[in-house]
Regions:
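Short aromatic-enriched loop/helix-cap "lid" or pocket-rim segments at secondary-structure transitions
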Residues: 19-22, 91-96, 168, 201-203
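Short, well-ordered beta-to-alpha junction loops that form the rim of enzyme active sites
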Residues: 57-59, 85, 116, 151-152, ...
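Active-site-adjacent alpha-helix immediately C-terminal to a catalytic or transition-state-stabilizing loop
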Residues: 63, 137-198
Length: 212
């Protein structure tokens, strides 16, 4: 029996607000020059891999990262779709605030709950659970059928959206998801089963220094 194709996931690289240490969430902000440079390097990690389909969020930092990766690979023909289900977690009232100043206001323990935990509420924002509830159905309904058809699929999204997706793919518990991280400058390659769950995982990384 043939196995499904390869799933590749990557986090957008440094945005203007990442550089400032600001919670970006649902806001749009462009990549920095460093972010563009490193996005191309991330593309270089995938040389020799034929990509059939690509997806990004509807946020410009994700779109710019995907575009830079495909440009580095000279894969301008690859169909790319931008979908809101892959958008970053909405940080609500914390959007636009310096995260390290917020750590002082909230205290270290509460700050880590907000950043890392499964169902920690944010005023007028999303929990990771809410992000999961939009990301995973999109993956199951749209991406998994492509993988089952033996396509190689690239997804470029955001830290929390990818954490939610990885928790499904890798069957990570709600308690352990706080330890899950999708690093800047990393691409993760999965071989998956017909439900989109991991059979094999490979991580490739470039050197990156991002204030996030």
């Amino acid at each position: 029996m043939k196995l499904p194709g390869t799933l590749i996931i990557a986090r957008h690289h440094e945005s203007e607000w990442n550089k400032q240490g600001v919670w970006t969430g649902s806001r749009d902000t462009h990549l920095t020059p460093y972010g563009f440079l490193k996005s191309r390097e991330m593309g270089g990690l995938l040389k020799g891999i034929p990509i059939d389909n690509a997806f990004a969020s509807m946020q410009v930092r994700s779109i710019e990262t995907l575009s830079s990766m495909l440009e580095e690979l000279d894969l301008h023909h690859v169909p790319a779709e931008y979908v809101h289900m892959l958008d970053e977690r909405d940080y609500g009232d914390y959007t636009g605030k310096n995260k390290w100043e917020m750590e002082k206001i909230l205290g270290e323990e509460e700050f880590e709950h907000v950043r890392r935990d499964w169902d920690c509420p944010i005023p007028n924002g999303e929990t990771l659970k809410m992000v999961y509830e939009r990301v995973v159905p999109f993956y199951q309904d749209t991406v998994v059928p492509l993988l089952v058809a033996e396509h190689t699929v690239l997804i470029v999204s955001h830290g929390n959206a990818l954490r939610a997706l990885m928790s499904y793919i890798e069957s990570i518990s709600k308690e352990d998801v706080r330890n899950l991280e999708m690093l800047f400058g990393a691409v993760v390659l999965y071989q998956v089963d017909e439900e989109g769950k991991t059979l094999h995982k490979e991580v490739r990384k470039i050197d990156s220094e991002v204030n996030a």
